[in-house]
Amino acid sequence: MPHIDIKCFPRELDEQQKAALAADITDVIIRHLNSKDSSISIALQQIQPESWQAIWDAEIAPQMEALIKKPGYSM
């Protein structure tokens, strides 16, 4: 705890880039939430652009009030 679930359009990330992303996010979570490294998990799911509406409908729009960073777009 915490678990971070990143969804994005497909990116060409190799394992080294994924590890660097995870390390950077982990450092931020440790600094701001006072978490232990061993408590943090991070998922990276690459979603095709034509499938993004489903993510918006299920995960973004219903939680708009809870988002600490709101998107600059709407669907």
Curated annotation (Swiss-Prot):
E.C. code: 5.3.2.-
InterPro entries for this protein: 4-OT-like_dom, Tautomerase/MIF_sf, Tautomerase_PptA
Pfam families (UniProt xref): Tautomerase
GO molecular function per UniProt: intramolecular oxidoreductase activity, interconverting keto- and enol-groups
GO cellular component: cytoplasm
Keyword annotations from UniProtKB, A to Z: Cytoplasm, Isomerase
Subcellular location: Cytoplasm
Keyword Transport: no
Coiled coil: none
Active site: 2 (proton acceptor)
Alphabetical list of HAMAP family matching this protein: Tautomerase_PptA (MF_00718)
Record's protein name: Tautomerase PptA
